[in-house]
Every structure is written in C-alpha cells, then in structure tokens.
Design a protein with these regions (language model features):
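Structural signal for membrane-spanning alpha-helices in multi-pass inner-membrane proteins
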Residues: 23, 27-31, 51-56, 86, ...
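Transmembrane helix-bundle core of multi-pass membrane transporters
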Residues: 3, 7-8, 96-168, 221, ...
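Hydrophobic positions within alpha-helical transmembrane segments of bacterial inner-membrane proteins
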Residues: 25, 29, 48, 71, ...
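Membrane-helix interface residues
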Residues: 34, 92-94, 169, 190, ...
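Helix-loop-helix "hairpin" substructures at the membrane interface of multi-pass membrane proteins
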Residues: 60, 143-221, 245-246, 250
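Transmembrane alpha-helical segments in multi-pass inner-membrane proteins
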Residues: 201-275
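Single transmembrane alpha-helix segments in multi-pass membrane proteins
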Residues: 1-58, 71, 75, 79-97, ...
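Hydrophobic alpha-helical segments embedded in the membrane of multi-pass proteins
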Residues: 17-28, 43-45, 49, 79-83, ...
Length: 275
C-alpha cells in the first residue's frame, strides 16, 4: 500500500492514472465502435511533440493563454496522427491495427530527431532533450509539494462527458451502432464511415491531450523518454474497465498502482524491468 500511504505518494499515483484514464476514454470510443486503434502510444507522442513545440515558443512575457494553446496543440497533434490511420482505412481499406501500430514507431523517430537535432538544448551538456519549458507553460498543480495537476480534473470531466455521450445522446448510440452493425446502421440512416472517423479522431485527440498534459506537467520538457508505454497500457485499462467510463476510472487507478509497484520492485529488490 505504499502508493497511497502519504499525500505525496497519492499524488504520484494520480500522476500515473491521469494519462492512462484520458487515453483509455478515447480508446473506449474506438473499441465500442469496432475500430481497433492500437497506436495510441504514437498519438500520445505526437501530442507531446506538438504541445512541446508550442511550449518552446513561449518566453517569460507570454500570457496565460499559452496553456490552452499547448493543450489544443496536443489534441490536434494526436488527431492528425490518428487521422492518417482513418484516411488509409477509409480510402484503401488498410488495417487500422497495422497502420496505427506502425505509426507509433514513426512518431518516436520524429521525437528522437527533434530532441537529438533542431530542438536540442544547446546548454544541456549534449543530452538529447529540449530546454526546460517556461514556468508560465506548466499545468497548474492541485496540491503544494505534489506533481498532481489539473489534468486529473480534466480526466474525470472526460469520464463524465463520455458517459453522457455514450448513454444519453443519439450521436453516441449512432456511433456504437455504426461500428458494431454497419448493415443495421445503414438501414437506420447512420454512417459507418462517420463512425470510423469520429472514433479515431476522438481517440487520437484524447491521446494527444494526455501527451500535452504529460510534457507540460510532470516532465516539463521533451526527452526521448516521453514514450512511457501509456498508450499500450491504456488498452488494458479500457478492457479491465469494460469500456465503461466509470469502470475505467478504477482500472486506471489499479494500473497506476501496478506501475508504481513495479518501479519500487526494480529499485528496492533489483528485479529486472522485463518482469
């Protein structure tokens, strides 16, 4: 129970849970629509890259508007990256599983090119990283002495919004029918093509938002270690939570405890990371 013993440890648990929950919420839209987006990790990375680029443009005189701009840049970065998968599936019937998965490695290569090249901090002792973002660009924190940010509130608000969308709106019903039963959807006047695009763009936008919150929050700069596996772990979070907005809140907390427990096992017991 070490991850919940102290306020600081609880804050670290929420730091891990926030990106997992946000990405899982987007993936739930995909999976409920029978669209298999396996590349949320790549969309997370591209959201971090575009958000990081926006943050690097800021200086000490930049206004508070920069934080919404960073988050919007992250959302758009993730949506564009997921849109590539949607386009190839829509126009050429390419497998979204393979395309989205391969784009993960392309996104990581883009990140590495930037932090080893044009965005590398000249005062960073040759380490592959950007300069630390200005304080004005950092996501506000919820507790003093903790890294827990308002990203947690965004994640919880997203969970509530998804519940309303899926179970209380006609658009949410059409989204699920369009993916799960294309023939029935066409008969009812719903578009399975629209369901594909909405699912991937929402999922990509959520992953990109998580990436933006991560680099403008706990990390505070771009490094090669931004890809932390959250995009893949969120698939587990989504299914353990049974693709339900409330269930995924609890599964995200469970997965976060496993993350932190694994890190403690590595540092204190010397267990290899592969275990």
């Amino acid at each position: 129970w070490e991850p919940v013993r102290t306020p600081y440890a609880l804050g670290e648990l929420m730091v891990k849970a926030t990106p997992l929950l946000i990405i899982a919420l987007g993936l739930a839209v995909c999976f409920r629509s029978n669209v298999w987006n396996i590349g949320a990790e790549g969309q997370f990375v591209m959201g971090a890259v575009t958000a990081g680029g926006m943050a690097l443009m800021a200086d000490k005189n930049t206004g508070i508007w920069i934080i919404p701009a960073i988050l919007l840049a992250g959302v758009l970065g993730g949506m564009v990256w997921a849109g590539i998968t949607a386009l190839l599936r829509d126009k050429f019937n390419a497998s979204e599983i393979l395309v989205s998965l391969m784009l993960v490695y392309v996104a990581i290569l883009v990140l590495n090119y930037l932090v080893f090249g044009p965005w590398k901090d000249p005062a960073g002792y040759n380490f592959p990283q950007t300069r630390t973002f200005e304080k004005i660009t950092q996501i506000p924190r919820l507790m003093t002495g903790s890294r827990m940010s308002v990203g947690l509130l965004i994640a919880l608000a997203g969970s509530a919004a998804l519940w309303i969308f899926l179970f209380r709106t006609r658009a949410g019903f059409a989204q699920q029918v369009g993916g799960l039963a294309p023939a029935a959807a066409r008969y009812a006047g719903f578009s399975s093509r629209k369901a594909l695009w909405v699912a991937l763009l929402v999922s990509g936008g959520a992953a990109g938002l998580a990436g933006a919150l991560e680099v403008a929050g706990p990390i505070g700069q771009l490094t090669p270690y931004v890809p932390a596996g959250y995009g893949f772990a969120a698939i587990i979070v989504a299914f353990v939570g049974r693709l339900h907005p409330v269930g995924m809140v609890f599964s995200a907390l469970l997965m976060s405890m496993l993350y932190i427990g694994g890190e403690l096992a590595q540092s204190r017991m010397g267990l290899p990371k592969s275990l």
